[in-house]
Amino acid sequence: MEFIQSEEMKRSEYFNIMIYAKPGAGKTTTIKYLEGKTLMLDCDGTSKVLSGLPDITIATLNPRNPVQDMADFYGYAKTHADEYDNVVIDNLSHYQKLWLMFNGRNTKSGQPELQHYGIFDTHLIDMISVFNNLANTNIVYTAWENTRQIQLESGQLYNQFLPDIREKVVNHVMGIVPVVARLIRNPETGQRGFLLTENNGNFAKNQLDNREFALQEDLFKIGDIDAKA
């Protein structure tokens, strides 16, 4: 165990970010705004939207062997960390489904059993933790969006958007990623941007700077903005 005085701590110049939205909203397209060289794992086959762009290396997850492919991708990313500025996993929602399907193939029913869900929860937390600890690398995760119902102390119920990750582990996952951003589109202007602060209808957080919203092309430009007078 290492001890350090808080005044000696320095804010990292690297970031870990999770972006989520409904399918087709532009999550994968956002990756083109990362600066530097990017290594990306395509879990859902949507990387074609990045065709022709420079400085992006894409590995494609084999849906028939997702567990080993994820382990191999981490091994490659760790070994070649000095060659890339960014590592992207696109997307966790589909990887979750592939993992459960893979582990259900050898059961009598051909479906994942109850124990597999708990094993996956542990696996996902461990996986994100080790990727977050890659040295000198920005890490970006994507996920589809889901909704959950929340009850206030007053008894009022409301629906909240959040990443489409298993309910029992999603809070933990969102807790260990400093930025969780929901991508939305303005229906009037067509402009896309990210919510970076939580409200009753959306889960979002930003522990890296004071921004509450960012245009799609500005998400990765980390830094405080001047407060309004």
Describe the role of every protein-language-model region.
Residues 139-214:
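Phosphate-binding/switch region of NTP-binding enzymes
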